[in-house]
Amino acid sequence: MLSGLQNPRQAAAQLMNFALILSTAFMMWKGLSVATDSPSPIVVVLSGSMEPAFQRGDLLLLWNRNMWQETAVGEIVVYNVKGKDIPIVHRVVRKFGTGDKAKLLTKGDNNNADDTDLYARGQDYLERKDIIGSVVAYFPFVGYVTILLSEHPWLKTVMLGIMGLLVVIQRE
């Protein structure tokens, strides 16, 4: 089964193929980031705070269109909070001002209160720089794999093991 790896050229070719796949995925991610003007053009809904609009596990496509058009009340945005690593998907419920100086207040559709408790200490509203992007499309439950991998770390090990085994036994 592993006799094909005795040839160093075959092993090097498989390693190069694996590196090519990884670099292609990275370039596609960076290209999508540039095209959407968003550092994270794809996010997964991690909680039920936006139900019924989005369910936990939905995959969202973002576009930072606010360079051409201002964020409007009712728009669903993804934003970062200073000091927290996880982006939040919520709807804009109030807007004060225009342009880069606009102040935005957000709230999850399934939440009773607005997001002021989620914002950084001393921050009452979001600013333009806090917005990662606006939701332009979604794929239901496609991102649930990400949630499973984060909630069950042993699944990562199993998946990486299977992928590694496939690389080793693959024959050209």
From Swiss-Prot:
Membrane topology value: Single-pass type II membrane protein
Transmembrane segments: 15-35
GO molecular function, one term: serine-type endopeptidase activity
GO cellular component, one term: signal peptidase complex
The keyword Hydrolase appears for this protein: yes
Reaction it catalyzes: Cleavage of hydrophobic, N-terminal signal or leader sequences from secreted and periplasmic proteins
Region described as C-terminal short (CTS) helix: 158-169
Keywords associated with the record: Endoplasmic reticulum, Hydrolase, Membrane, Protease, Signal-anchor, Transmembrane, Transmembrane helix
Top enzyme category: hydrolase
EC numbers, comma separated: 3.4.21.89
Disulfide bonds: none
Top-level taxon: Eukaryota
Biological process, per Gene Ontology: protein targeting to ER; signal peptide processing
Lumenal side: 36-172
Stretches in topological domain Cytoplasmic: 1-14
Compartments where located: Endoplasmic reticulum membrane
SUPFAM superfamilies according to UniProt: LexA/Signal peptidase
Principal location class: endoplasmic reticulum
InterPro entries from the UniProt entry: LexA/Signal_pep-like_sf, Pept_S26A_signal_pept_1_Ser-AS, Peptidase_S24_S26A/B/C, Peptidase_S26, Peptidase_S26B
Residues at the catalytic site: 49 (charge relay system), 90 (charge relay system), 115 (charge relay system)
Function comment: Catalytic component of the signal peptidase complex (SPC) which catalyzes the cleavage of N-terminal signal sequences from nascent proteins as they are translocated into the lumen of the endoplasmic reticulum. Specifically cleaves N-terminal signal peptides that contain a hydrophobic alpha-helix (h-region) shorter than 18-20 amino acids.
Similarity field: Belongs to the peptidase S26B family.
Domain remark text: The C-terminal short (CTS) helix is essential for catalytic activity. It may be accommodated as a transmembrane helix in the thinned membrane environment of the complex, similarly to the signal peptide in the complex substrates.
Subunit (UniProt): Component of the signal peptidase complex (SPC) composed of a catalytic subunit SEC11 and three accessory subunits SPC1, SPC2 and SPC3. The complex induces a local thinning of the ER membrane which is used to measure the length of the signal peptide (SP) h-region of protein substrates. This ensures the selectivity of the complex towards h-regions shorter than 18-20 amino acids. SPC associates with the translocon complex.
Name used for this protein in its record: Signal peptidase complex catalytic subunit SEC11
The organism of origin for this protein: Metarhizium acridum (strain CQMa 102)
